[in-house]
Amino acid sequence: MSCDCHRNNRKRALSTRLPFGVGTHKPKHFRDMLKIAWENKDNLSYAWKILSRGVCDGCALGVAGLHDWTIQGVHLCMTRLNLLRLNTMPAMPADALEDVRELQGKSNRELRSLGRLAYPMRRLKGEAGFHRVSWDEAFQSLAEHFQNTPPQRSAFFVTARGVTNEVYYMAQKAARFMGTNHVDNAARLCHAPSTAAMKRTLGIAATTCSYKDWIGTDLIVFFGSNPANDQPVSTKYLHEAKAAGTKVAMVNPYCEPGMERYWVPSNAGSALFGTAITDHWFPVSQGGDIAFLCGVMKILVAEDWIDRSFLESHTEGFESLERQLSELEWGPLERDAGLDKSSMLAMAELIRDAKNAVLVWSMGITQHGFGTEAVQAILNLGLLRGYLGKGFNGLMPIRGHSSVQGGAEMGAYSTVFPGGVPVNASNARQLSEQYGFQVPDWPGYSAVEMIEAASKGDLDILYSVGGNFLRTLPEPKRVADALCKVKVRVHQDILLTDQAMLEGGEEVWLLPAKTRYEQRDGGVETSTERRVMFSPEIPRQVGEAMSEWEILRELAVRAFPEKADQMGCESGWLMREEIARIVPFYDGIQDLRQTGDAFQYGGPHLCPEGVCPT
């Protein structure tokens, strides 16, 4: 049977009847808001400009200013507020990094509290710390390194949080301008299984529906996903959905507290007594998702609770799936899922009774060695019922960090060009004709492969735009050893990390970047629901920080001045015009000018009426 999250103990049941969740472990929204205001008291005016004019940098849900495209009202969450200080803090003292030994052992939170990186700095092997240099010296020295390094021995990595599409685009273009396809970004690490399975099955690599489809659908199922934590504003959508009669099911080993009951601070009733989110919890064992899904599908097919008309008109391979499911035995399925057949029947009955449904998944599904297969199972479940290409239905991978959807679409992957086009000789020739310079046609390193190459001594330059491999990849000691072997490491960032303090093979550089809000000519990000949104430039100058895309562009043309005219993208406006030409489904990006300007590529629903590119 499915479990009821809301009856775990008497104390919890009592707390739901007490105002503000007294006695419950829950976010203290109003207290924390006051704390955030105090932290930003030295720059409150700028903080307000960010909140009222900028696109949220907290997650991939997509809020422009304080409003969105799903429901009316003011939208603000603690994820966004907790990041506010990163955008308002003053510069780090110029001499703070002269001896980094004094900073060893400090947490990344403590390092961030030192302030913004404000000036280009370099640390040579054997030196105790970093010393300030001019931008001209930094560009000239790094340009010479790239000139003297075979392209196969240099690599670029781009983080996901806070990065705009312009930065993704320029990172991949600069890398390929300098002859390498070794470029990757953090978003691929999170949802590569989703991309692979969706491309293969549907011919697309993004959510098929919109957030509006949550409100009014019969059922939402969350697989390995915790939107209350990852996209807090989405709890407002779930509050509205519950009021409209939507049932919510969660398939996850752990009953996430925020998905059990959430206190939406902007809704009086919810702020007082909370909103019960999950109706049915299916506590699969870790890694048991595929077995559970196969059991559910086995019942659906056996009982003929499927949409045969949809399957016959819009899919192929059903007979093969039917045969495979019929051969599965219940004993192994129950053992692997960690749930008995009655639980799978309970889920199958929920699916049977839901004419419309949205299936949502996140990293609890993708971060397994069999992540692609798990996503495939979710897609198969949705196709069996025809939950595709129409209102109140969809297959939705939840993205975490802001603008991660744009990473692959801008081409900041080692295996795809802009538009998600695979790297091969034919596509490289076409992109070379568009760019006017030769684009490499060989697949590059992923982030993990970059570290492997560094460990073997096969990587001479590693250029990181944000990010911290020590905190995102397994075996941090091994990662640190590999990073220390790279001759030249460049850390383009707004803040200091412990990764940047590792001694380099020869040189380590710190290049101070502007935030997304300070970025010249504004910036664009793409949300989970494929909404391309403009965030205007909110001027502020911290030391000598430069816009991230400008740093990358300047380095590329300094390294290869003989083809500088072919680089283009002299401004953010010109770059967006180029993106519209190179990535046709982003046509319209060139017309975005102010807060609230946006478009949703593909419209509210991809695969309309079940017709997919495949």
Regions found by a protein language model. Give the residues of each.
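A terminal-accessory region detector
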Residues: 405-407
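N-terminal amphipathic, basic-rich helices that act as targeting or association modules
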Residues: 28-32, 44-98, 102, 131-135, ...
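Cofactor-pocket helix-loop regions in the catalytic cores of large enzyme subunits
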Residues: 3-27, 115-403, 417, 428-611
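Intrinsically disordered, low-structural-confidence terminal and linker regions
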Residues: 1-55, 59
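Surface-exposed loop and adjacent secondary-structure segments within mature catalytic domains
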Residues: 411-415
